[in-house]
Regions:
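Conserved catalytic or regulatory cores that recognize and/or transform ribose-phosphate-containing ligands
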Residues: 1-152
Length: 152
């Protein structure tokens, strides 16, 4: 039996709307599933956050939204994934959590696919450029690279 193919779907959450955090991830999960690739969303099982207009640090007392809950599961997901897809499109402020996930993915030797504008993204930085094995300008291109990584 072939090992399940996992890709972690990283990107800004703090300061975004619930749908802003989930819509692109749900799309990616649906598209990757067509190729038997499982997308791991840090927003899974967090429907309780829908009631909030914007997601900000400390917004919920739910165990999955606690400091430990977020960090523990996200690190575990990055560690067990085979690749990471970072969607930084349209970011309005630096996503500290996503930058930490870049560090984890690097430490765990995961291939990086970064989806980011060619110019003007607030995350534009030498280390992000260096860590990004693949950099594309839209989500569909990013998903195509992920599929290519798993084409064996």
């Amino acid at each position: 039996m072939q090992k399940e193919k996992l890709v972690y779907l990283a990107g800004p959450i703090d300061g975004c709307t619930y749908s802003g955090c989930t819509d692109w991830r749900e799309y990616a999960i649906k598209e990757l599933k067509k190729d038997n690739i499982t997308g791991l969303s840090p927003m899974r099982a967090k429907e309780f956050l829908k009631e909030h207009p914007k997601l900000v640090d400390g917004i919920s007392k739910h165990v999955l939204a606690s400091d430990a809950g977020i960090t523990t599961r996200d690190m575990w997901d990055v560690r067990r994934s085979d690749a990471t897809l970072f969607n930084l499109l349209g970011a309005e402020k630096v996503s500290i959590g996503t930058m930490i996930e870049y560090g984890w993915a690097s430490a765990f030797n995961k291939p990086f696919v970064t989806v980011m504008e060619k110019q003007g993204n607030i995350h534009e930085h030498a280390m992000i450029r260096r860590l990004s094995g693949y950099r594309v300008e839209n989500l569909d291109e990013g998903l195509a690279v992920v599929r290519a990584l798993f084409a064996y």
